[in-house]
Amino acid sequence: MIKKMIRLNLDDLALQCGILAGTFVLTQLITACLLLFAGVRSSLQLSGVILPLASGLLLLIFTTVYTSFSFEECIRFSHTRRSALAGLLGLSLFQAAVAMGLSALLTLLEQWFTPTLWTALSGASGYELWIGGYAAGSYGTESTFLLSIDRISLPWWAVLLIALGCVLEGVFFGAFVQRFGRKGFWILWGAWMVFIFGQSVIHWDDLFHSVWFLPVLIALVVLTFLWSVWSLLRAAVRQ
């Protein structure tokens, strides 16, 4: 079932990979233009943050669509609820592995090759690399100036949590819409709008550094996923 679902949705996987590759190329073009035409003397290697987050957003969207619509289609084609859920979950996890793998590959490509390219575009005689706010070394001479490059990336465990969390929450969003229909969609949309417009009153730094934030977040994701499994295994399929 899982292999069949993967084969049937290869176009979705290609679309996700294309979006990630396009995001990578766009960020490199913007950086190159700033160095070449704006005369800036510093740059950021951000693919290690941007690409995992973009992958997570894509996984959330596609998993939501699979769960809310494709799940019922599978049941209409004589699959059991259990096999349909397993197939869609396996599909989403496979796409997560490919998306995060591509993100890691593009991040390594940026880290290996762009310092030399950016140095040439900026007219610098070398570059100074910073990782996580700490100097990691200087390369070249200071006959003109050294280009300052700050490398920012997420730790591997955060990337894994993003991938798994977005897949599980995508299942929850899809199950919510599947059970409650249009009302469920608007409830989720309203919650999202509250989250977006409530940014000014949310103290993210305090939340991220609190000892309970990550355990509570993980518990919430697990509980919503368990509810999703319960709901989908008892779902009424609309004809």
Which positions does each model-derived feature cover?
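Hydrophobic alpha-helical transmembrane segments of membrane proteins
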Residues: M1-E72, R81-Q239
